Curated annotation (Swiss-Prot):
Family of the protein in this entry: Belongs to the DEPDC7 family.
The DEP domain, residue ranges: 45-137
Gene3D superfamilies per the UniProt record, alphabetical: Winged helix-like DNA-binding domain superfamily/Winged helix DNA-binding domain
Descriptive protein name: DEP domain-containing protein 7
Cross-referenced SMART domains: DEP
Region annotation (Disordered) ranges: 148-167
Gene: depdc7
Classification via CDD domains: DEP_DEPDC4, RhoGAP_BRCC3-like
Amino acid sequence: MATVREKAVSLNLCATYSPAQRPPGPNGSHRPFRATYIWSSIIQALTQVEVKKRRHHLKYHHDCFIGSEAVDVVFAHLVQHKYFGDTEIPRSKVVRVCQALMDCKVFEPIVTACMFGREKKRTVFEDSSCSLYRFINNSSHLGAQVEKSNGRCTPQRPKHSSFQSAPLKSPSLEDLWDNLSLTAADPTHINLTANLPPKVVGEVWQEQTIRRLLQLVDLPLLDSLLEYTPVAPRIPQVKEEELNLTSNYLDREILKAFSDAQADEWVSAAVDCLDFLPDHMVVDVSRNLPEQQAPDSKWKLLLFDTIGKHYQNRSPLLRNQLFDIHTGIAELLVNGKNEPALEATQLCLKLLDSPSREEFRRLLYFMALAADPSEFRLHEETDNRMTVKRMFSRAVVCNKNLSKGKCDLLVLFILDHHKDVFKIPGSLHKMVSDKLVAIQQGSDPDRDTGYTFCQRVDKREFDSATQNNTRTELCALLKTIYENTSLSPKEKKRLLGQFYKSHPETFIQYFGDRVSSVYT
């Protein structure tokens, strides 16, 4: 007669009821331990990050993703599925989660740091658009392993994945959550529903991005924002298999080989921008490359002038359809509100289509390198930062209704924060999560979403704001009348007299001791 162990082996019950594959729960689904499930779902979500060929530090790297985008994906997953209830999750703690995943070999950094003549891989995960990572490939089947000696769960790739994960040598997963000051929610409340269609998720992201923008920026009209639809880039990128068939492919390859031969990140970033230039400009650059003996200034100026010429003659990357948003961000900067301005800029860039975001990211990275005062001097009489601003302002934002001062302020602000402007704000993650959960649960998705267009204030604060705003606008009107050179002296005196009769206190406050000389 067969023993119980033999029957279990014949029915493969060990695999079915292992810690990685627990017996069915009350709802009939197979669920692993809660911590193991959370880690597995995080790793599975991370595989949705955009992976493609990228160029960095003078080399091309295949199948890479950006550190900041990995944080965005994990952040969105944690907030959307509410593993920790309604607890607010700072971005810095999501970075620590990514650090733990890198420590246990889910992915690895591909950018190396040179120390004392030796290359050494970075050990600290960087939430940056300049840091590249790659999943570790292995054909081994992976599951959630449990260290029986201390009960620690190890995050591993799902069995259908081809990524390998080594045992976690840091504290257990439960300890990691405690160290992050995050309390896991009731497992019965964890969102295990199927994913929504990508179209629905995309519409929610755009809707909530606009909603958050309206909370940060005062807009006179909403039509342009509410009717906004991403526009395809003017110069579409050519597929790699089609690019091989064009006569200009060789010129682009020559430029890439030329930049590879130069130990200069400046040149590498410039050549990356050439991918978005038309063929005839790339051909001109390729066939006018200087000789090897030529000084750096000659070919760097050639690249800088070519890229600048292209972007001076095309529409800005921050499209004029969102002009009111750009004006609002500039007003925030004028008033010294840098944090809201940065978040509004991040939201504005989130509305761009993916090709435009990638083009802007490359251009901004090149601008930041070229603006560095320690880099090659672009102009003899002007520092690099001002030269870059003057050359590429039209490429970033250009509208005749936005004053030059505010335009320059906005461009320099984006340039100074080029490492942060492509990150997704945590507030947007929370808003998108709440909306998606409401849709999945079948409840009203627009209920309890916070104010969008106004905020309730008490009567005293309202009256004070009304008086201050009225006084400010009256002073602005008085200044316009007094400094308007197109008005004749007689007409100006008449208008000032009318203003004095209607608002004598504001008139006296503005002119002070000069009242008699101005009014008479």
